[in-house]
């Protein structure tokens, strides 16, 4: 017998709400536009900070720093400092970050396949005033 078979509906809703609450911060991180772009770039291999900044149009130095720190905190990106002068800092996907490549690529493919439909829907919505 499955545990959900013996849980009352109100309890089930409570468990689902708790699950959403637990997953929400993770989805906020991996669903953030800058995080997605960083994961896509690092999927091709390790990069230095300025390389990432050059590849991501419109991101400020502060936002790149904050996003990388968040990804590092969540275990998705590693930061390696080489003891050179000046210090060389390299960012790479961790094993956990590597596991995010496929879903991010799938999301990108979906977006590219449906961009025309989405733009048309936006235009219809905006035309309503």
Residue spans for each PLM region:
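Amphipathic alpha-helical dimerization/coiled-coil segments
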Residues: 2-8, 101-129
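Basic, amphipathic "hinge/linker" alpha-helix immediately C-terminal to the N-terminal HTH DNA-binding motif
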Residues: 83-107
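Basic amphipathic alpha-helical segments that dock to polyanions
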Residues: 64, 68-71
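Loop-helix junctions at membrane interfaces
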Residues: 3-7, 15, 93
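N-terminal helix-turn-helix DNA-binding core of bacterial DNA-binding proteins
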Residues: 13, 17-63, 90, 98
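Short amphipathic alpha-helical/adjacent loop interface patches that line ligand
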Residues: 46, 56, 68, 97, ...
């Amino acid at each position: 017998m499955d545990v959900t078979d013996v849980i009352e509906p109100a309890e089930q809703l409570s468990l689902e709400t708790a699950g959403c609450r637990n997953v929400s911060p993770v989805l906020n991180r991996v669903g953030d536009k800058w995080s997605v772009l960083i994961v896509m770039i690092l999927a091709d291999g390790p990069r230095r900070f300025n390389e990432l900044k050059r590849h991501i149009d419109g991101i400020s130095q502060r936002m790149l720093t904050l996003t990388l720190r968040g990804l590092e905190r969540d275990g998705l990106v590693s930061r390696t400092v080489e003891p050179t002068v000046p210090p060389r800092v390299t960012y790479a996907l961790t094993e956990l970050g590597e596991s995010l490549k496929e879903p991010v690529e799938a999301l990108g493919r979906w977006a590219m396949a449906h961009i025309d439909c989405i733009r048309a829907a936006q235009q219809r919505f905006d035309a309503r005033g």
